[in-house]
Amino acid sequence: VSSQLINIQPLSQPVDLNVAPATFSPDVEAEIDRHLAKYPVKRSAILPLMFIVQRERGGYLDPAGVLYLANRLTLRITDIWEVATFYSMINTEPVGKYHIQVCKTLSCKIRGAGTITEHCSSKLGIKPGETTADLRFTLSEVECLGS
């Protein structure tokens, strides 16, 4: 069965398609071109390009960035969104200047990750998944970053 025909996962959140694709400076476009040249199949460049677009779009992959990637890689928007929502290092919402990510897996919880999350939450006055009012800190629980 062709991978183009399989798309049974619903989007975890809607993407506003009433935007124009992002545009970038010639330097950023050249950086993207260099990455694309490394891969014989354009789709294989999806993660490096997501990191570039995220960096250039204010620290997260916004709808305009998603549309840009879909156009540039000749992929469906759902293909881009599935990858973006799978990896915890791709932000699909704005995050604070300092993004604190604490592992939520059992092995890290046993070693004290829960205590770290509770301490950060207490000091910052936010719960995991939230950003401080001054947009300085975001606290997130993620899959293990060390494995």
Regions found by a protein language model. Name each.
Residues 2-147:
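Signature of N-terminal electron-transfer/Fe-S-associated modules in redox systems
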